A protein has these predicted regions:
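Glycine-rich, charged/polar anion/phosphate-binding loops
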Residues: 130, 192-193, 201-203, 234-237, ...
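A structural signal for short secondary-structure junctions
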Residues: 243-244, 259-261, 269, 294-298, ...
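Extended hydrophobic packing segments that form well-structured cores
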Residues: 354-401
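Long, well-ordered mid-to-C-terminal structural blocks that present hydrophobic/aromatic surfaces
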Residues: 240-295
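Dual-mode signal for accessory low-complexity, basic/Gly-rich regions
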Residues: 275-349
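Short, glycine-/Ser/Thr-/acidic-enriched flexible segments
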Residues: 39-40, 104-106, 150, 212, ...
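Active-site bordering "gate/hinge" segments
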Residues: 1-247, 389, 399-401
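Histidine-centered active-site/metal-ligand motif
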Residues: 109, 332-334, 362-368
């Protein structure tokens, strides 16, 4: 577990991340939501005090317990399932920042809930996410999140609680006297790589590993982003491609937990941008149901690469925040099925209308599910000039940060 000094450092890093995640600086009396699991209660207290000292307005929200969540999905009728409490839209429409603290007591309690019910609930909440996305695009909102160790997470990762905790401490630089300075250094180094990537005029990327043969088309007016403060930790660099140009095979060698369901060995075959063949060693019925949630659920919303020189994460953590930032021996490549990120648009995201997003191939969905491959791989950029450049190999980008 984390001691008081480490929690204090975590809070400092989260506030650094929140500041970086905002396009505009916070003003006095801006509203910041802190949403947390019960196990993250102490960190939420530390954050509230710091936010008050900054002259901001903290709003605390405790996540439902595993029992509450299970009862909700088992007992709710259709009307209850999609119910949005009065005041919720008003709160979201006025938020200037949000910090999410994850420390789940269970990650499998929804395993027996029909996937169609989970999908219905997820779609009903998309309207709230759309409010925050719009505010984010306008520079009125920023968010960050983190995870704390729990017995449940450690158990499903196959690690002791101490080993699990140490992975978090090292990944977030909480063992450093000045973790914010370390994050700032990584932030600046990542900027150099993003600048190099965004200087290339790319027709498509070709990803090759033992089990991957995938073509990804970045599309027009795209840029690589990442290490923006949104996730602590975050080492990935990514873009939201033109989903229509995706073809070939992607394989996730890393397992995944989603809505209480365990999925392993996912193999996706893409044709004309859509996953037309979906296979999994475990959880195949669940992933097939999730990928039929809406029209965009079986299409790619994100293409991501993590440089092992940045990330200290070397173990499976049974949590997407850490698993999508896996460093290990070979770094990782992952795709997210579902929603895309408008901030990977090269222009002003606030000018992106729904019609313009569709025209440029930005995918839209209530789903966003990251699937991770940690195999040794090569990623080649095929340039519009017909030249080819290997941009990523052996777990790192082909340029020094």
């Amino acid at each position: 577990m984390l001691n008081e000094k480490q929690l204090e450092r975590y809070a400092q890093v989260l506030l650094w991340g929140l500041d970086k995640a905002r396009k505009k600086k916070f003003k006095q009396n801006d509203i910041v939501l802190i949403r947390y699991h019960l196990g993250a209660f102490r960190l939420s207290e530390i954050l509230e005090a710091k936010i008050l000292q900054m002259g901001l307005m903290p709003v605390q929200r405790l996540n439902p317990t595993a029992t509450m969540e299970k009862n909700f999905f088992e007992l709710s009728n259709n009307k209850q399932l999609i119910f949005i409490p009065p005041g919720e839209k008003e709160l979201y429409a006025n938020l200037n920042g949000a910090i999410f603290l994850f420390c789940p007591e269970s990650i499998t309690h929804l395993a027996n809930i029909p996937p169609i019910k989970i999908g219905q609930f997820t779609r009903s909440r998309k309207q709230l996410r759309n409010i925050l996305d719009t505010r984010d695009e306008r520079g009125q909102f920023g968010w960050t999140l983190c995870m704390l160790p729990s017995d449940e997470l450690a158990k499903h990762a196959g690690l002791s609680l101490e080993t699990y905790s140490q992975q978090i401490i090292k990944a977030c630089f909480l063992n450093r006297k000045d973790p914010v300075a370390q994050w700032q250094n990584v932030y600046e180094n990542a900027h150099k790589i993003k600048k190099w990537l965004n200087g290339l005029s790319v027709s498509y990327y070709h990803v090759e590993s033992n089990n991957i043969d995938l073509y990804v088309q970045p599309g027009e007016h795209r840029k690589w982003i990442g290490l923006s403060g949104h996730n602590i930790p975050s080492f990935e660099l990514f873009l939201s491609p033109d989903w229509r140009g995706t073809k070939g095979v992607f394989f996730a060698d890393q397992p995944s937990y989603r809505s209480g369901n365990y999925v392993e060995g996912v193999r996706l075959e893409f044709q004309r941008g859509a996953a037309v063949k979906i296979e999994a060693k475990s959880g195949q019925a669940f992933i097939q149901e999730q990928l039929s949630m809406d029209k965009g659920a079986n299409k790619v919303g994100e293409f991501s690469l993590t440089d092992r020189r940045f990330s200290k994460i070397s173990r499976f953590m049974a949590n997407t925040l850490f698993d999508e930032n896996f460093g290990g021996r070979h770094g990782n490549c992952h795709i997210a099925l579902g929603s895309s990120y408008s901030d990977t648009y090269q222009g002003d995201p606030s000018k992106l209308t729904k019609e313009r997003k569709k025209e440029l191939g930005f995918n839209d969905s209530a789903l966003h599910w990251d699937l991770v491959n940690t195999e040794k791989k090569r990623v080649t950029a095929h340039l519009k000039s017909k030249d080819q450049i290997v941009i990523y190999e052996n777990g790192q980008f082909s340029v020094s940060p």
